[in-house]
Amino acid sequence: MTILPFAVSHLETLVLQPAQAAWQGELCPDSLQALEATGEAWSLLVRQRIIGCGGVQEQGGGRGLAWALLAQDAGPAMLAATRVVRRYLQASPYRRIEAATACSFAPAARWAAMLGFSSEGRMRAYCQDGGDAERWAYIIPDRQES
């Protein structure tokens, strides 16, 4: 697995898992360009193919918002991806990193828990389709504000 700086073009070849497929046409080009410019986003390359993109968007006050888009066949690479993301979380400048997972997609919640996030509860009607989401947080209490 190779970790690359995120580029908007990486999303063009990424065939998203069905639970995330609705996002493909909803991603704002300006937002994607901003993610690319920040340097706080990466892509995972396996056998010369992008299998996932993700990162953390700064929210101010020492907070970040985690995001990830994964290929439908990313499963075999998830152990290695989990290790990479854990290392990032442990070294990140944020004291709090937030994430949301669709309640209808249990594997996302399992991955958040494996990464060390703690559930903060259900957010009603949060998802694009009107479905509920679970809010997660990764907290490092002694981390200085970024």
Language-model regions, residue ranges each:
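Short amphipathic alpha-helix that is part of the acyltransferase structural core
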Residues: 1-28
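A conserved beta-strand-loop-helix scaffold within acyl/acetyltransferase catalytic domains
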Residues: 54-62, 123
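Conserved beta-hairpin
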Residues: 39-57
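Conserved GNAT acetyl-CoA-binding A-motif
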Residues: 92-103
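Conserved acetyl-CoA-binding loop-helix of GNAT-fold acetyltransferases
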Residues: 75-90, 110, 114
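Conserved acetyl-CoA binding element of GNAT-fold acetyltransferases
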Residues: 61-73
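Active-site rim helix/loop that mediates acceptor-substrate recognition in acyltransferases
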Residues: 22-41
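Conserved catalytic-core motifs of GNAT/GCN5-like acyltransferases
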Residues: 100, 118-133
